[in-house]
Regions:
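A short, N-terminal "cap"/entry segment at the start of jelly-roll beta-barrel domains
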Residues: 1-40
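Glycine- and acidic-residue-biased ligand/ion/polar-headgroup-sensing regions
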Residues: 61-78
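Tight coil/turn sites that cap or link beta-strands
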Residues: 48-51, 93, 99-101, 111
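Conserved short histidine dyad/triad with adjacent acidic residue
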Residues: 42-61
Length: 133
């Protein structure tokens, strides 16, 4: 796997922590970030199906963060500095960071809900299509 992706499991705990998941009979609370600044916050869902994907691009400057609310997604990655291709499966409760010059495409293994955030406004010139996964 490329060094341009970082995956972190948010711990499930009753203890006070700035980043965690709390699962109770009444529902779930996820403390995703605390202290990080961001200017863009988005949400997307992705259904399983032939030809259904999100992404298919890379960024020269933007560092993207994602939180998996539910489901499982196969992420196809290409490190554009080394040419190395890899895949990883991300799932509910994981926080993911994708760094610049890493082409990425998401395909659902099961229907998924995802929060996306980053510390810049959306810049269409930094959303560069990529197809060679």
């Amino acid at each position: 796997m490329t060094e341009k992706i970082h995956i972190e499991e948010l711990p499930i705990t009753e203890k006070f922590m700035r980043q965690k998941r709390l699962i109770q009979d009444r529902g779930e609370l996820a403390l995703i970030e605390d202290g990080r600044e961001f200017q863009h916050l988005g949400y997307f869902s992705l259904k399983k199906g032939k030809g259904y994907y999100r992404g298919g691009h890379y960024h020269r400057r933007k560092v993207e963060h994602f939180y998996m609310v539910s489901g499982r997604i196969r992420v196809q990655l290409v490190d554009l500095d080394t040419g190395k291709k890899s895949e990883v499966v991300i799932r509910e409760g994981q926080r993911v960071t994708i760094y610049p010059n890493c082409a990425h495409r998401f395909e659902a293994e099961e229907e998924a809900q995802v929060i996306e955030y980053y510390n810049s406004m959306y810049d269409p010139e930094d959303d560069i299509p990529y197809k060679d996964f």
